[in-house]
């Protein structure tokens, strides 16, 4: 058998134009994103985070601005109403047998002594002789004295060296608050009745009126 002829037939059987199919190879660099893409992505994420934090900060700030006037208003209301820091309303209360009036507590003595002794007696009660601050308070005191025939020392005496009436706190009597009937001489003290205010000797025996400031309980 002629081997050259067989080999030639085999070669003749194959199509001379046939070639094996091949796929183009992809470069490894083609699958990689450019470096600036990564940089842009990082910058974008950082920007979004920064914007989010800014929005949160603005939200908190705006809420604070909105609530601040309300907080201040509540704080002022708490001070005016005498509320305690715990939020419970503080009660203003006078001791037993004391008469409340605005921010004061008043009490009338049951005994008669000179003005100086009345001053000491009030001090022992952590109080002072009555200081009348305005016409409204004068009317209130005279109203609670209705039906009483006695006169009552108050914290007002005549200072001869200054030739004027002064309260025990050092303030000068204002004539528009009350007028005193009687002499203006040394050792003169003021006494109040349910109708008038009189001048009498500080050494005379009379009742008196004490006052103290209302306390929180």
UniProtKB/Swiss-Prot annotation:
Location(s), subcellular: Membrane
UniProt cross-references to Gene3D superfamilies, sorted A to Z: Mannose-Binding Protein A, subunit A
Protein task: Binds CLEC2I/Clr-g leading to activation of natural killer cells or stimulation of IL-2 production and proliferation of T-cells in response to antigen stimulation. May contribute to the formation of the immunological synapse between T-cells and antigen-presenting dendritic cells.
Protein name: Killer cell lectin-like receptor subfamily B member 1F
Biological process annotations from GO: regulation of natural killer cell mediated cytotoxicity
S-S bonds: 122-210, 189-202
One MF term in the entry's GO annotations: signaling receptor activity
CDD domains per record: CLECT_NK_receptors_like
